[in-house]
Amino acid sequence: MRSIRFFSLIIILGIMVSCNKDQAISMHWDETGCFNPWDNFITLDTFTTEAYHQGINDYLTSEGITVNYISSELDSSKIEYCFACHCKTGKVITINIPKEDKRKLKRLSGNNQFGLAFY
C-alpha cells in the first residue's frame, strides 16, 4: 500500500512539472538587410546594439508578445554576400519569450516569398 502511494505521488508531481506553461524558450531570427519584421520600429540617431534590441522589444511588445531578453551574435557561416533586402547579414537575433507566446512569434514572419521565419 505504501508503494502505491509513493508511485502515485511521483506520477502526480511529474505531471505537474511537465505541464508548466511558464517555461521560457529561445527563438532565433537570421537578420536580413532590410526585411526584418521590426525594421519600422528602429529609429536610431546613433547605432548601438542596445538601441536595436530595444526597437525589436518595442515591436514584439506591440504585437502582444512578452520578451524576457534579446541577444544577438554574428555567425559568419550565415552571411550572404548580396545587397538585396532578403539577404542575411550573418547576425542571429535570439529572443527569449514565454513558451505560450511561441505561436504568436512564429505568425509574425507570415508567408513571405523568401522563406524567412523564426526557428
Regions found by a protein language model. Give the residues of each.
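Surface-exposed, low-hydrophobicity interaction/linker segments
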Residues: 33, 41-83
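Immediate post-signal-peptide N-terminus of mature secreted/exported proteins
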Residues: 24-35
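Hydrophobic alpha-helical targeting segments used for export or membrane insertion
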Residues: 9-13
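Bacterial N-terminal signal peptides that target proteins for export
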Residues: 1-7
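Second-shell loop/turn segments in exported
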Residues: 40-47, 89-95
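C-terminal motif of bacterial Sec signal peptides marking the signal peptidase cleavage site
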Residues: 15-18
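Bacterial signal peptide processing site
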Residues: 20-22
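Short, compact, well-ordered microdomains
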Residues: 83-119
